[in-house]
Amino acid sequence: MHLNRASLMSTCLALATLGGAALADDLPPLDAPESAHWHAPSQSWYVSSLGGGMSVARDGIGWISRYSAAGQLLEARWVEGLDAPTGMTSHGGMLYAVDRAGVLEIDIEARRVLRTIVLPDAVTPNDIAVADDGTLFVSDMAGNRIYRILPGATATLWVSDAALEGPNGLWVDGERLLVATWGPAKEQGSIETTRPGRLLAVNLDHGSIQVLFNGQSIGHLDGLVGLDDTLYVTDWMTGTLLRVAPTGAVSTVMAGLPGLADLGIDPSGRVIGLPAMQDNRLVLLNLGETSP
């Protein structure tokens, strides 16, 4: 997520496709959409909107919308009254959404926020990922922190290190937490960086940080998902979806979508959901069965 763009674009973009891309219904349910999450049991895409343009104030005007697998709008305000919600994940019938108050635990069937899990001293809580046992991990981009929430528990600070380099997108991969970084800030609280971000891995047992792919800089990274042995990341600044091969080779999958944020993935259907923050759109990209 990038928080300092002033305006939203409304122009319909021509989209490059890989196996076919489809725009969700051109209705007004989205306002600065930040995250798309696929929930297989309900066969739904959930998309968070900051609300109020790029505002990240605790103003209660953010919401989550629900779309079908094909991208049809089902509920424009599935849950509302939120404070600039960003990253999302799900586990055990619950949707977990990060907003300015902390992590919201939402009962999916009841469409009701059950509790808010406070993130102590968080600066800009952003993305969230879940392990198989239900443990949650939350990135704090400006704070260079990652929080951990054990099932049924409160949040604790897990890793705090400048080596996290503006942690943004998170993805659990076996015994490690993969981190897509924005890049090292030139100064505290600045979005300007000394270089673009890269990919890291944090060991789930002891929290040690490993720089991946020989430390190559990739971009000002936002979202991160994995499929098979391939990673997909978004570069917010360039509006680009990138594929990262197991060798570290980076290739462009799609370009021209300003403010590409926290993507989601339907691994069974091999479909990626892309929220375009500056264009107020959800883009569904079918990777096809033969994507490398």
Language-model features, listed with the residues they occupy:
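Beta-rich, blade/repeat-based domains predominating
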Residues: P29-Q43, L50-S55, G60-I61, V79-L95, ...
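Bacterial N-terminal signal peptides that target proteins for export
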Residues: M1-T11
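Bacterial N-terminal signal peptides
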Residues: S10-L18
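A short beta-strand motif characteristic of beta-propeller blades
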Residues: D25-L27, Q72-V79, R112-V118, T154-S160, ...
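Asp-box/WD-like beta-propeller blade repeats and closely related beta-sheet repeat scaffolds
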Residues: G102-V103, I108-D133, S139
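Short loop/turn segments that connect beta-strands within beta-propeller blades
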Residues: Y67-G71, D107-R112, I149-T154, N203-G207, ...
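A short loop-to-beta-strand structural motif that recurs across blades of beta-propeller domains
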Residues: G60-S65, G102-L104, R145-R148, R198-L200, ...
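Short loop/turn segments immediately following the C-termini of beta-strands
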Residues: L50-G52, R100, M141, W182-P184, ...
